[in-house]
Amino acid sequence: MAREFSLEKTRNIGIMAHIDAGKTTTTERILFYTGRVHKIGEVHEGAATMDWMEQEQERGITITSAATTAQWKGHRINIIDTPGHVDFTVEVERSLRVLDGAITVLDAQSGVEPQTETVWRQATTYGVPRIVFVNKMDKIGADFLYSVKTLHDRLQANAHPVQLPIGAEDQFSGIIDLVEMCAYHYHDELGKNIERIDIPEEYRDMAEEYHNKLIEAVAELDEELMMKYLEGEEITTEELKAAIRKATISVEFFPVFCGSAFKNKGVQLLLDGVVDYLPSPVDIPAIRGVVPDTEEEVTREASDDAPFAALAFKIMTDPYVGKLTFIRVYSGTLDSGSYVMNTTKGKRERIGRLLQMHANHRQEISKVYAGDIAAAVGLKDTTTGDTLCDEKHPVILESMQFPEPVISVAIEPKSKADQDKMSQALQKLQEEDPTFRAHTDPETGQTIISGMGELHLDIIVDRMRREFKVEANVGAPQVAYRETFRKSAQVEGKFIRQSGGRGQYGHVWIEFSPNERGKGFEFENAIVGGVVPKEYVPAVQAGLEEAMQNGVLAGYPVVDIKAKLFDGSYHDVDSSEMAFKIAASLALKNAATKCDPVLLEPIMKVEVVIPEEYLGDIMGDITSRRGRIEGMEARGNAQVVRAMVPMAEMFGYATSLRSNTQGRGTFSMVFDHYEEVPKNIADEIIKKNKGE
């Protein structure tokens, strides 16, 4: 199967936006105009082609990024749909990692919204060129120039219109092209009947003004164009297009388009913009990687002749073909049925079948080429972020960085039959989503699931019910407390049972003392003259370690203490390992009264990124959660607050931050260290655990 589209005519793009800006509808229209969908699916009716999971159709939000391929004017456009909800930012990060360019969709009434800020920041991190589509021009309150202003004010983006709308709200009837200096008039509802016309008289001055502003903005980034402009020479449409393309690809300039995807206006011109201004795989720097073992840095050029290298960016479980691994091919070619090396895991994998995905149906292909996005069937060990490559030319492409989960809840199956199904479901869901974790708590035996937010875990539990038919109860979030000693003391532990027949005799003196935080348990044998025989010393240590697991205050494990066995006695006949084990555990119990035990709690290192105007509220909120502010800094137009906050106070924080900042704040947290719980709070926890 020969290559259908050259690399220069391939575009890998994502569509990113705030929730409800009309991203899915825009994607739908692109698929409709590129001839991939025969009937347009409306999100309002829950039938969009890209939203293929049941829950997405119900909630009307896009959760997983489906990858679709479409064709426009001799170009192949691969589209990755990305979610717009805060809890799903990992999906967005994943998609951005494998894209060459993106369309940012704005709502013409709101302009740049909170989640737009977040995805824009992520796209800037990955250096993704963007064009902007101001959507919903037909909506009441639509204001194109206000939306462009929010790009400058909220994102400091060098964004300039390449189009102007003719009319707005229900009067929106056409678009002015500021590059070619002509206009397009729409005659029908489906937007298929477009007429190219001269710019209407009443818009001519405005068009002229914005045409000149566009040339000035682009000329600032292009010396040749600047010279021509200053000397008053005519700048041709081709020269202007080439200069916009160059500035867009170098992420110094963002062209702004307008339209209404719902009313089918402006989508074809947006597609022209994708072809004209967004990069092909050849236009972006070659991907970097390292050779396993030697750590030597290498690059992989976007070329079919280079050795094969690809990145797995998404795992999905498909009801018909099983596990699908979505891959972005950076270099070389790959045949179905061949073997590849997963260098991240160090395992060889066989590619069973290769599928090119259209949002709701799939087409089997025999080969993929550099620059392609496809789904592979049959990979067993590959997870998100892994590199697949030619066995003879191993490379590890830089992998994706995923944030640690920030919220945990206990989950238990409703019936015995659900137990096995639940562990299978959790394993599959973890493979698909690197920010979701599941583990069994050895102390309580409960299964604990952790994720990026409350909505994230809701959807996981929901998917377990729908896709894996597992019914489960979800508990309240839990904190892993610990206990330790503050004072040193010498304590006796005596276990003697002698009432006829074989007795039990174990007797120890142990000196307990606090150890440095994080150092764990240290045991020392200081017996002189065999008062406790050597063979019983390991039993003393084991007895202490077992007893420490159950705590002395509230049933939490004891950590960071030293124990020195310095005296004791034994009986020739009645002493045994068991007796000394019990004696040691009694010594630990007795230490509770003498060593001043305290509760420890996990302290999280929290970083909150918020617009300046919310700074006071957020700092007040952190302090009310027993947090200590460690520092602040400005990052662009946002403020970053760093603080240490007890884990117990962080429950519900994602939701509270979202409402305190209208969704414009984001936060991340990682475990830092354990610290003493204040006495009044510790007393409550101890009371609760003793069931008082």
From Swiss-Prot:
Citing just one GO molecular function, the answer is: translation elongation factor activity
Gene source species: Geobacillus kaustophilus (strain HTA426)
- Domain of life of the native organism: Bacteria
Q: According to its UniProt record, which protein family does this protein belong to?
A: Belongs to the TRAFAC class translation factor GTPase superfamily. Classic translation factor GTPase family. EF-G/EF-2 subfamily.
Main location as per UniProt: cytoplasm
Q: What residue stretches are annotated with the tr-type G domain?
A: 8-282
* Keyword Cell membrane among UniProt keywords: no
| Name listed for the protein in its UniProt record | Elongation factor G
Q: Does the keyword Magnesium apply?
A: no
Transmembrane ranges, per UniProt, are none
Look up the record and report any one GO term of the cellular component aspect: cytoplasm
Q: Cellular location of this protein?
A: Cytoplasm
PROSITE patterns noted in UniProt: G_TR_1, G_TR_2
* Upper taxonomic lineage: Bacteria, Bacillati, Bacillota, Bacilli, Bacillales
Q: Where does GTP bind?
A: 17-24, 81-85, 135-138
Keyword field? Cytoplasm, Elongation factor, GTP-binding, Nucleotide-binding, Protein biosynthesis
Q: Which SMART domains match?
A: EFG_C, EFG_IV
PANTHER family to which the protein is assigned, alphabetical = RIBOSOME-RELEASING FACTOR 2, MITOCHONDRIAL, TRANSLATION ELONGATION FACTOR G-RELATED
Question: What's one Pfam family here?
Answer: EFG_III
GO BP terms:
ribosome disassembly
Tell me, in a sentence or two, what this protein's role is. Catalyzes the GTP-dependent ribosomal translocation step during translation elongation. During this step, the ribosome changes from the pre-translocational (PRE) to the post-translocational (POST) state as the newly formed A-site-bound peptidyl-tRNA and P-site-bound deacylated tRNA move to the P and E sites, respectively. Catalyzes the coordinated movement of the two tRNA molecules, the mRNA and conformational changes in the ribosome.
InterPro entries recorded: EFG_II, EFG_III, EFG_III/V, EFG_IV, EFG_V, EFG_V-like, EFTu-like_2, G_TR_CS
